[in-house]
Amino acid sequence: MLTILKTGQSAHKVPPEKVQATYGRYRIQALLSVFLGYLAYYIVRNNFTLSTPYLKEQLDLSATQIGLLSSCMLIAYGISKGVMSSLADKASPKVFMACGLVLCAIVNVGLGFSSAFWIFAALVVFNGLFQGMGVGPSFITIANWFPRRERGRVGAFWNISHNVGGGIVAPIVGAAFAILGSEHWQSASYIVPACVAVIFALIVLVLGKGSPRKEGLPSLEQMMPEEKVVLKTKNTAKAPENMSAWQIFCTYVLRNKNAWYISLVDVFVYMVRFGMISWLPIYLLTVKHFSKEQMSVAFLFFEWAAIPSTLLAGWLSDKLFKGRRMPLAMICMALIFVCLIGYWKSESLLMVTIFAAIVGCLIYVPQFLASVQTMEIVPSFAVGSAVGLRGFMSYIFGASLGTSLFGVMVDKLGWYGGFYLLMGGIVCCILFCYLSHRGALELERQRQNALHNQDSLQLADAQ
């Protein structure tokens, strides 16, 4: 890995009397840095969607070519989440995230000066690859600075960064068009968002923090022994800091059944989510005979209902469920099953919109809770690798099932075939939520036993 991305040497130790105050200040800065950084990734990702009408008009690209460009980015992003998140385990989170933003900005500048389809395709693939550098550092930072009892709320706050980022792309690009004019559509669509992303990258470098130990503070496990993840693994003679990213992935993720359970939870969540997002507009227009305006309202409710529900879910999983994430995820998926039937069978505009909003409100909750659980089933130094497996599985398999396989089912069996596919996915998701919950309870028991044994040894030494 490039030297500039590595974690670097530990800072001078913070005096004991200043540890609590410094810790509190640094963790807020760390959270803000990954919130703003991940938000910025969406500015240089979703701007491509806003540029597609001009790709068709100005560059004479066909709908098939534009669809191929979108697919290239999706596939590249899915692969990148797997690889880049694993590499992030061995890097400085703030430098890794900022570097990815700058690389995305450079690619967008290239898009601003390109006109050939194949150059566009290559740059879009590179953008997808560099986009994967954002999520790993985010989860690593949260795992390093926040205990399990707070991760539901903290993770929920971070999770809405993509809603905020996706929401401010249009105003940024719109303002650029107003100032530059439509004749400079490439500058407005790509170069201006790239400049904004570079500014955010600088903010990440200034605000961001490494692990507590790298900032001269005790680690989270030292300050709160109950945070230590106890795993039964083989061939772990090497210290984690002396292991490569691949060795960490193989030892702590690939052989970890809980990492696979939570990844499969995400696969089926993404299947339902992408099945709804990709096919909701055409289903409402062709089957329910909605107008375009009515369809847009239903789609708007589906997307924006996620923000309050995510924040509430974070609070509930911390407070009501005491840090156990999967029971709430199972409840949400069961409710989605019922609402999906209502959405499918209802004829009323109001009822279809309500059911679509409820599904949108709930579908992001299991996805978010799976991301929080990922931080709790592996040691902090392997979080990026676990996030990488989950990201790869969800995009390459989950999104494909919800888009391509749904389309095949509709062509072969009609719309009811597509809905049966989604309902089957919900049942599978609930099954893996249950298995993941059992695994989390097992880890919790191991943690408590380890703490009990440690207390017994300390008591024996004292005597």
From Swiss-Prot:
Induction: By extracellular phosphoglycerate. It is a multi-pass membrane protein. It is found in: Cell inner membrane. GO terms for biological process: glucose-6-phosphate transport; phosphate ion transmembrane transport. Signal peptide: none annotated. The keyword Cell inner membrane applies. One of its GO terms (molecular function) is glucose 6-phosphate:phosphate antiporter activity. Residues 1-29 are cytoplasmic. The chain crosses the membrane at residues 30-50, 59-79, 106-126, 127-147, 160-180, 188-208, 267-287, 297-317, 326-346, 349-369, 391-411, 413-433. One of its GO terms (cellular component) is plasma membrane. It holds the Pfam family MFS_1. It comes from the Bacteria. Keywords: Cell inner membrane, Cell membrane, Membrane, Transmembrane, Transmembrane helix, Transport. NCBIfam families: 2A0104 (TIGR00881), PhglyTportPgtP (NF047787). The phosphoglycerate transporter protein is a part of the PGT transport system. It is the membrane bound transporter for phosphoglycerate into salmonella. This is Phosphoglycerate transporter protein. It comes from Salmonella typhimurium (strain LT2 / SGSC1412 / ATCC 700720). The lineage of its organism: Bacteria, Pseudomonadati, Pseudomonadota, Gammaproteobacteria, Enterobacterales. The gene is pgtP.
